[in-house]
Amino acid sequence: TLYFIFGIWSGLLGTSLSLMIRTELGQPGSLLNDDQLYNVIVTAHAFVMIFFLVMPVMIGGFGNWLVPLMLGAPDMAFPRMNNMSFWLLPPSLTLLLSSAPVESGAGTGWTVYPPLSSNLAHMGPSVDLAIFSLHLAGISSIPGAINFITTIINMRWEGMMMERLPLFVWSVFITAILLLLSLPVLAGAITMLLTDRNFNTTFFDPSGGGDPILYQHLF
């Protein structure tokens, strides 16, 4: 229920951002009169919709509710881990929203692309807040994925083979596995970006021997 409430609230927020984007694009002149502000709205809209609407509602809400029902299990394998997974999301959303009013906001597109988010183009804490927000959202989804995989493998009714599972359970299972495979790569990319910005490393800076294309590959 908490996942649904959180998802609905974030969805309303994301929809309001979406309406601003549509209004800006749906008329000949400029509505906001500020390209940077428009980019900030696009960036925030993408993050809010993916990490705080689709994932909590589809996986957190429907997943936690329907998967145990479809398996004949009394609950998820690790209910407390589920709880921990949820309570990392509100601070993550808070960090993302606080990145918008700080300085000129993180208007880098939803990938937080390095040339745009270098310390020259984006000085100060705005992009860093967006990156920390991504970290928290990622950390939140890892225990959730482990929980789903463990539940589906270990908590089926006796006699319920894997090939008899409903397709919804299979879809959650495969999604969780793919999430665990892909998240460390994304975490590595944004951690390297964070150190590039704050500790003068040159993972993505060609002048220091780094590779500017590497980030796109990782992402």
From Swiss-Prot:
Gene3D superfamilies on file: Cytochrome c oxidase-like, subunit I domain
Protein name from the UniProt record: Cytochrome c oxidase subunit 1
Record-stated family = Belongs to the heme-copper respiratory oxidase family.
User: Matching PANTHER family, A to Z?
Assistant: CYTOCHROME C OXIDASE SUBUNIT 1 (PTHR10422:SF18)
> Known catalysed reaction(s)?
4 Fe(II)-[cytochrome c] + O2 + 8 H(+)(in) = 4 Fe(III)-[cytochrome c] + 2 H2O + 4 H(+)(out)
Query: Can you tell me which residues bind Fe(II)-heme a?
Result: H45
| One GO term describing the cellular component | mitochondrial inner membrane
Enzyme Commission (EC) number: 7.1.1.9
- GO annotation (BP), single: mitochondrial electron transport, cytochrome c to oxygen
Name of the coding gene: COI
Topology, Mitochondrial intermembrane side? 23-39, 107-128, 188-219
- Determine if Heme is one of this entry's keywords: yes
Keyword annotations from UniProtKB, A to Z: Calcium, Copper, Electron transport, Heme, Iron, Membrane, Metal-binding, Mitochondrion, Mitochondrion inner membrane, Respiratory chain, Translocase, Transmembrane, Transmembrane helix, Transport
Q: Which positions, given as ranges, span the membrane?
A: 2-22, 40-60, 86-106, 129-149, 167-187
Q: Which InterPro entries match?
A: Cyt_c_oxase-like_su1_dom, Cyt_c_oxase-like_su1_sf, Cyt_C_Oxase_1
Give the protein's biological function: Component of the cytochrome c oxidase, the last enzyme in the mitochondrial electron transport chain which drives oxidative phosphorylation. The respiratory chain contains 3 multisubunit complexes succinate dehydrogenase (complex II, CII), ubiquinol-cytochrome c oxidoreductase (cytochrome b-c1 complex, complex III, CIII) and cytochrome c oxidase (complex IV, CIV), that cooperate to transfer electrons derived from NADH and succinate to molecular oxygen, creating an electrochemical gradient over the inner membrane that drives transmembrane transport and the ATP synthase.
UniProt pathway annotation: Energy metabolism; oxidative phosphorylation
Q: What class of enzyme is it?
A: translocase
What taxonomic lineage is listed for the species of origin? Eukaryota, Metazoa, Spiralia, Lophotrochozoa, Mollusca
Instruction: Give ranges for the Mitochondrial matrix compartment.
Output: 1, 61-85, 150-166
GO MF annotation: an example: metal ion binding
User: Which coarse location class applies to the principal site listed for this UniProt protein?
Assistant: mitochondrion
Q: Which cofactor does it need?
A: heme; Cu cation
